[in-house]
Amino acid sequence: MMTKNEIQKWVKEFPLLKTIMAAEEVFWRNPKYHAFAQAIRTIPLRERDVKEAEERLRRFAPYIAKAFPETRTAHGIIESPLVRISNMKQRLEKMFQTNIEGELLLKCDSHLPISGSIKARGGIYEVLKHAEDLALANGMITIGDDYAVMDSEKFRQFFSRYSLVVGSTGNLGLSIGIIGAKLGFRVTVHMSADAKQWKKDLLRSKGVTVIEHLTDYNKVVEEARRQSAEDPTSYFIDDENSIHLFLGYAVAAFRLKKQLEDMNITVDENHPLFVYLPCGVGGGPGGVTFGLKLVYGDHVHCFFAEPTHSPCMLLGLMTGEHDRVSVQDFGLDNKTEADGLAVGRPSRLVGNMLENVISGVYTVDDSTLYRLLAAMVETEEIYLEPSALAGVAGPVRLFRDLAGQTYVEANGLKEKMKNATHIGWATGGSMVPKDVMEAYYREGVRIETMTGNGFSEGR
């Protein structure tokens, strides 16, 4: 817990904190942002680590294709579409009276097979890695084998001797629960107070043990970690500090490169790429950012998006204290409809590794998320959960907020913006039950009718 004096000292040093503490929307440009060639020197991971993760996912593709028929057409590769959303771009420009230069795309991790969110990348990857490690160590397989053999009673019996434990606000729990149970593991998911009921119900229907907590995400992770430590057959998936989750997310960047090439979209010195990533604890956006920087270096600019009531990564980066600060220290309640982003304390791993790599962070109010959700349905017929819309707000904020424009000018991008590509990373949505999604849409329409006047003024 930070003292009152420390908070006051920071408010003096960072005047933007006053606005953050009032739970108002802000756009923050990272003053520690460096050229990637310089920034990577302090990062303990390299491209070979990501390539190794990609290779492992390839080994598991025959198993995935067999166990999850919906992945067969993609031959067991878990990937999502990248789509142009020009109608939504026009709607954004109209809603917020802002001209967005360049093209706007949506990366639909909301529609990833198996668990319908970005967590299908990191979560599924880490479980598969653990399964491979166990199977190799026990002589069940060798690296050259066809991993489709894992979809058998023999392997399910073997994996049932082991358990997986994770703490989650929802989507990570879904991905680990679904893949873990399918392999045969005993899975326990500890869920925080803000987790949606339908996510708990879905997990239970797959045979996963769900333990509900009244506390917030960080306390839940602590409890899950403690429970796992008591059982020698248990493996704890650490959302706050896992390198394996991080690498699973990073693989996305190399696949995105191919998708952009297939769409004839150039990314180079004169064609900058801007990527806007919803951020909870930071593992998902952190891994994707690291991967994108490996692929595009300084030609890609990654911004994290957080709810106004849960800006944990923003506070960690701004103060340089990372996981030593929480949103509660600054008088914020960590309550948001963006359940996947309701995190009070950021990942130390991501904050430390990427403090010179993340271009900036902006915050979005729940009402803005709902308005964008309704607009996305009306313009593109794409259904997303509220947290996924945080990334879609990015281009408006970049062009409308003073700090966004300062970033563009400071990086010599002003004349290049007409050639820019903007990608909002849609993190979840396809598994939301129809009635819940309908209620989200109605809420968006209601707020739009009431307000209809854009974001709060940029600061």
Swiss-Prot record:
N6-(pyridoxal phosphate)lysine: residues bearing it: K119
Keyword Lyase: yes
Cofactor needs: pyridoxal 5'-phosphate
An annotated Gene Ontology molecular function: D-serine ammonia-lyase activity
Highest taxon in the source lineage: Bacteria
Catalytic activity: D-serine = pyruvate + NH4(+)
One Pfam family matching this protein: PALP
This enzyme's EC code(s): 4.3.1.18
GO biological process per UniProt: D-serine catabolic process; isoleucine biosynthetic process
Keyword check for Hydrolase: no
Keyword annotations: Lyase, Pyridoxal phosphate
Classification via PANTHER family: D-SERINE DEHYDRATASE, THREONINE DEHYDRATASE, MITOCHONDRIAL-RELATED
Family, per entry: Belongs to the serine/threonine dehydratase family. DsdA subfamily.
Protein name: Probable D-serine dehydratase
Species this chain originates from: Geobacillus stearothermophilus (Bacillus stearothermophilus)
Lineage of origin: Bacteria, Bacillati, Bacillota, Bacilli, Bacillales
Gene, per the UniProt record: dsdA
